[in-house]
């Protein structure tokens, strides 16, 4: 893609980020925002020249904030900050997260409150456009005073140090910069602090988690529709009158979509035909899935605010006339949103696993035990339910809120922190587990409807089944099902799913 997205510090959306992250859209900076950057930079240079005592510009950091820094040591101060704070550990963030961090940090600096030179922003954008993505360890951030350790690893690359992902491999930053003819920079007053004082690690991880979660939320309804057919579920539960009586718009949306997917099915039933009511995991799909959608809307709102937020400290206002120390680096808003996201997505896996149980348990349906082609000789999909149960149980541990914890740091100067980056990492892992649980439900549901007879399926779900069988063949004998789960999950993650039909059933006046 050759389209150019101009960042301005105030209008970046999740839709924009999706194009930049996954479609390779290039980025630049708006002229208006760059003018603001230049004005705030003049203020920083004047503060240094006048030897004013301003935190982070002419003082040390954290507990050292009461130590004045000589003008001759200002550059050294900024470089020492990056080197000393680049102490993350663990596996690196996914490359998509690293790319998102670059975009978000540039966008925050373009608000013009941080006092960096335009050159710093230009270099960040150059890395994005050259597909040079810093290798950033996932562990080590408290989520206040910003994501210090992760962003320090990002900042190292601007100096020509550290490691990057480049052309599919991990290599030295100096090599990648040379290949792309990007000159390393020397940091001057406040620039080191401006690069690392922010919430861009937790927010970037949150963006990727959200984008994957939204796709899974749609897919979970389609998979549940297949399960409804496999279990001859009662369609009356999706009558919109029930859901209007409750009043939650997201619940109504889910019910409408489910009813639409199944509208011409000969496998679903009406109340009283086979049974009076279905179990909750079928009957309450709109209520449970709808509640997850409520959470997704909330998380989206918070992410898009944070994506365009000034999270530095201090901030420069009124064309440099006012420099104020504050706490916009504190990640509590995103920390809470990420905990909420993890909990809501874990619930999709919880209810999915219960539907899996109903598909494989012969006491709960009239299908062959464990959907086996030769019960007894073959185990069928018995252990797939075990795997789903394990993932669901793991999610319950991961869903424990990170934001309720806080450990003081910097000699108790930073005595309350958000742990938001832990929360975003946990939410992301939960979402990976949810995808695998849904992949298992998909495998079981496809097997069930094929046993019932696909000629009786709804036209929409039949198309899904036909596409799904390209990835997971019909199970006529036991095989190594790990590969089936892997292929199904890959289809859910990377496959092209047309959500047009789904969005048609949303109440557009709400979104």
Swiss-Prot record:
Presence of the UniProt keyword Aminoacyl-tRNA synthetase in the record: no
Pathway terms, separated by semicolons: Amino-acid degradation; L-histidine degradation into L-glutamate; N-formimidoyl-L-glutamate from L-histidine: step 1/3
Family: Belongs to the PAL/histidase family.
Sites bearing 2,3-didehydroalanine (Ser), chain numbering: 145
GO cellular component: cytoplasm
GO BP annotation list: L-histidine catabolic process to glutamate and formamide; L-histidine catabolic process to glutamate and formate
Modifications the protein undergoes after translation, according to the UniProt entry: Contains an active site 4-methylidene-imidazol-5-one (MIO), which is formed autocatalytically by cyclization and dehydration of residues Ala-Ser-Gly.
Cellular compartments annotated: Cytoplasm
Main localisation: cytoplasm
Origin superkingdom: Bacteria
Name of this protein: Histidine ammonia-lyase
InterPro entries assigned: Aromatic_Lyase, Fumarase/histidase_N, HutH, L-Aspartase-like, Phe/His_NH3-lyase_AS
Organism: Halalkalibacterium halodurans (strain ATCC BAA-125 / DSM 18197 / FERM 7344 / JCM 9153 / C-125)
């Amino acid at each position: 893609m050759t389209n150019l997205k101009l960042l301005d510090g105030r209008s970046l959306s999740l839709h924009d980020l999706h194009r930049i992250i996954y479609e390779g859209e290039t980025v630049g900076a708006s002229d208006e925002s760059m003018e603001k950057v230049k004005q705030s930079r003049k203020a920083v240079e004047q503060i240094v020249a006048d030897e004013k005592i301003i935190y982070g510009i002419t003082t040390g950091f954290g507990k050292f904030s009461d130590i004045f820094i000589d003008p001759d040591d200002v550059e050294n101060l900024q470089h020492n900050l990056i080197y000393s704070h680049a102490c993350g550990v663990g596996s690196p963030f996914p490359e998509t997260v690293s790319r998102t961090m670059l975009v978000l940090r540039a966008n925050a600096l373009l608000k013009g409150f941080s006092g960096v030179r335009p050159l710093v922003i230009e270099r960040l954008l150059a890395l994005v456009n050259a597909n040079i993505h810093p290798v950033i360890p996932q562990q080590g951030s408290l989520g206040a005073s910003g994501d210090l350790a992760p962003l320090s690893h990002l900042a190292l690359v601007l100096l020509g140090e550290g490691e990057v992902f480049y052309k599919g491999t991990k290599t030295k930053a100096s090599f990648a910069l040379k290949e792309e003819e990007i000159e390393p920079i020397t940091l001057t007053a406040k620039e080191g602090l401006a690069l690392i004082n922010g919430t861009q690690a937790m927010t970037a991880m949150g963006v990727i988690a959200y984008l994957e979660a939204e796709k899974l939320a749609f897919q979970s309804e389609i998979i549940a529709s297949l399960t409804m057919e496999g279990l001859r579920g009662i369609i009356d539960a999706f009558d919109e009158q029930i859901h209007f009586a409750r009043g939650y718009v997201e619940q109504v949306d889910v019910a409408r979509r489910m009813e639409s997917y199944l509208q011409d099915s000969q496998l679903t039933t009406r109340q009283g035909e086979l049974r009076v009511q279905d179990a909750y995991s079928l009957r309450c799909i709109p209520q449970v899935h709808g509640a997850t959608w409520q959470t997704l809307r909330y998380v989206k709102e918070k992410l898009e605010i944070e994506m365009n937020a000034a999270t530095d400290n201090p901030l420069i206002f009124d064309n440099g006339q006012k420099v104020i120390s504050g706490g916009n680096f504190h990640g509590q808003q995103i920390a809470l949103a990420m905990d909420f996201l993890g909990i809501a997505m874990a619930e999709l896996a919880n209810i999915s696993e219960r539907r899996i149980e109903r598909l494989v348990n012969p006491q709960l349906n009239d299908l062959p035990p464990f959907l086996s082609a030769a019960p007894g000789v073959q185990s069928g999909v018995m252990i797939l339910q075990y795997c789903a149960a394990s993932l669901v149980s793991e999610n319950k541990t991961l869903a424990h809120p990170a934001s309720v914890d806080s450990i003081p740091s910097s000699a108790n100067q930073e005595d309350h922190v958000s742990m938001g980056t832990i929360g975003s990492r946990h939410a992301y892992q939960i979402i990976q587990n949810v995808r695998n649980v849904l992949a298992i439900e998909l495998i079981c549901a496809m097997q069930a409807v094929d046993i019932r007879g696909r000629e009786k399926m709804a036209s929409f779900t039949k198309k899904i089944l036909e596409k799904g069988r390209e990835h997971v063949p019909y199970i006529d004998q036991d095989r190594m099902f790990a590969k089936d789960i892997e292929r199904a999950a890959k289809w859910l993650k990377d496959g092209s799913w047309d959500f047009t039909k789904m969005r048609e059933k949303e109440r557009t006046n709400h979104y």
